[in-house]
Regions:
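Membrane-proximal alpha-helical signals and transmembrane carboxylates
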Residues: 3-9, 13, 17-382
Length: 382
């Protein structure tokens, strides 16, 4: 017990010392909340949402304020140095929650784009990386009628999209680990800015409403990289298949059609277990998916007794999941031969001898890989 306490004390001292190691006063630091990277005229354009007491109010009334500052240079380093010259402050990335990579940066080497952040002393390893359709600057500077959208709100939108199966999380530490694998592959969510019509109250003294377009963030695709380069995008269904086959679905929402009646499915709990085995020169991955789900809707419109209805809905759910998984593995393994399914990790752990013998011809391994999927579904009907 004394040893444990001693270790904790030393660890605490190290944390305190590391926190105090810099000599820069907080007033001299530019506290960055969001970063965006674009390529313009063969130059890097870096956009930052920076905490600023005298800046523009964020969307939550009474909340913090921020400025959006940009810098350009022939490297990310020099673009950030320009931001420091403009602000007169040292950029601090320790509070940064999101890194947007613009569409113009999509064809750049992903490892090179992230190098500055991986080498920075204070960058949070859980930093979320997101590709954008359009300019990253537009996302960093996105405004509502009440001001700039805060990093916390954007992070919350991403979390909800991940939960709903629309996005796959890509955090800095994980992406860096991914691109150190044989194929240098990784998958990163893609975000769009879309406009929706929304009824808003004209003023507080009137019940009259008017329709106005509101900008919202939406996730529906996933960028796939191979050899550190962007190669293709997965759609929403393929993204969900990717999440099933990498045990990233914990809960999700979807809908199915049962005899012409729409039924909402809430997956409250899910787990995927994967075990590879070798048959000749082929890899078969035994895949067991266990889910607890709830079905809701106008189920009385379906002319089935409870037992038949439960069986019918279960089969619909299973078929939907299998379709998503098969679609994903076909496009990734057969067409693009890109391992963002963590197959290398599975082989290295469970079939190490085979992995060592075959890694020099890894694309052939992927072509000869298949999944044997079984699904167990516990269902409640409301």
């Amino acid at each position: 017990m004394k040893k444990i306490i001693s270790v904790l004390v030393v660890f605490s001292m190290l944390i305190c010392m590391s926190g105090c190691s810099g000599t820069t006063d907080i007033e001299k630091r530019a506290i960055v909340q969001i970063v965006g990277i674009d390529i313009e005229n063969k130059q890097y354009k870096v956009s930052m949402q920076i905490f600023a007491p005298d800046g523009e109010m964020l969307e939550k009334k009474g909340g913090a304020k921020a400025d959006v500052v940009t810098g350009t240079g022939n490297s990310i380093y020099y673009a950030i140095k320009e931001i420091e010259m403009k602000t007169g402050k040292e950029v601090f990335l320790g509070h940064n929650m999101l890194l947007f990579l613009g569409e113009s940066a999509r064809n750049e080497n992903i490892n090179d784009l992230l190098e500055y952040f991986t080498q920075s002393e204070y960058v949070f390893p859980g930093l979320d990386i997101v590709m954008t359709n359009g300019k990253a600057y537009d996302f960093v500077s996105l405004k509502l009628s009440t001001g700039l959208i805060s990093s916390q709100t954007m992070e919350d939108i991403l979390k909800v999209s991940i939960q709903n199966g629309n996005a796959k999380r890509a955090q800095l530490a994980q992406v860096v680990a991914d691109v150190r694998q044989i194929q240098k592959t990784t998958a990163i969510p893609i975000v769009d800015i879309t406009e929706i019509a929304q009824d808003v109250q004209v003023n507080s003294d009137s019940e009259d409403k008017k329709t106005q377009d509101t900008k919202v963030l939406s996730f529906s695709k996933t960028a796939v990289f191979k050899d550190n380069r962007y190669i293709m995008s997965l759609d929403k269904e393929q993204t969900m298949g990717l999440k099933w086959l990498t045990n990233e679905v914990k809960n999700a929402f979807s809908s199915i059609d049962v005899n012409g009646v729409p039924v909402g499915i809430s997956i409250d709990k899910a787990k995927t277990t994967l075990r590879p085995h070798i048959t000749g020169d082929k890899v078969v991955i035994d895949t067991q998916i266990k889910i607890s789900a709830t079905a809701s809707g106008n189920l009385s419109l379906i002319s089935k007794n409870n037992s038949e209805l439960e069986s019918l809905i279960k089969n619909k759910i299973k078929n939907q999941i299998i379709s998503q998984c098969e679609n994903t593995q076909n496009i990734l393994l057969k067409k693009y031969k890109a391992d963002v399914l963590d197959i290398e990790k599975l082989l290295r752990y469970y079939q190490r001898s085979f992995y060592l013998e075959s890694r020099d011809d890894y694309e052939r391994v992927l072509e000869n890989t298949s999944y044997d999927i079984s699904i167990k579904c516990d269902l409640e009907i409301h």
